[in-house]
C-alpha cells in the first residue's frame, strides 16, 4: 500500500511539473486596451508620445504579467493588477516621476550627472541601473 501511494505521489508530481513547464513562457500578443487600466493610465501619462509596438500577456501557473515595448525600445512590465514592476529604457531615461522620491533625492546627491536607465520594483526592494552601468539596490521602506 505504501508503495502504491508513493508511486501515485510521484506520478502527480511529474504531471504538475510537466504542466508548469508547458504553461511557462506563454506570451500572447494583446491590444493595448486589454492591459489593466492602471497600466494604460501610466502609459498615457508618461509615454503618450511613444507608440506601443507590442503588448503581451504572459500567463503562468500562479501569476500573470503584461509586457509592453514602445517605439523607442523602452520595455515595461506590469503585474496582473497593472502595477509597474520593471522599466528598461534602451534610449533615453526613466521618467523622473516613476522613481520614488527618496531614491531621486539619493541619486541627486550622490550621482547628479547620471540618468536612470532601468528600475525594477520587487516585493521588498528597488533595483536601479544608472547610465554608467552602476547597479544600486534600495529597500522599499
PLM regions: where:
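Interaction-mediating elements
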Residues: 25-141
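Bacterial Sec-dependent N-terminal signal peptides
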Residues: 1-27
Amino acid at each position: 500500500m505504501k508503495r502504491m501511494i508513493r508511486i501515485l505521489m510521484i506520478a502527480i508530481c511529474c504531471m504538475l511539473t510537466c504542466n508548469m513547464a508547458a504553461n511557462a513562457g506563454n506570451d500572447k500578443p494583446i491590444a493595448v486596451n486589454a492591459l489593466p487600466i492602471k497600466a494604460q493610465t501610466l502609459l498615457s501619462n508618461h509615454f503618450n508620445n511613444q507608440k506601443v509596438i507590442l503588448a503581451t500577456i504572459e500567463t503562468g501557473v500562479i501569476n500573470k504579467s503584461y509586457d509592453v515595448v514602445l517605439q523607442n525600445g523602452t520595455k515595461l512590465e506590469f503585474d496582473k493588477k497593472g502595477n509597474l514592476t520593471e522599466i528598461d529604457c534602451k534610449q533615453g531615461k526613466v521618467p523622473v516621476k516613476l522613481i520614488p522620491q527618496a531614491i531621486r533625492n539619493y541619486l541627486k546627491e550622490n550621482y547628479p550627472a547620471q540618468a536612470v536607465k532601468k528600475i525594477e520594483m520587487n516585493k521588498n526592494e528597488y533595483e536601479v541601473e544608472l547610465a554608467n552601468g552602476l547597479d544600486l539596490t534600495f529597500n522599499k521602506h
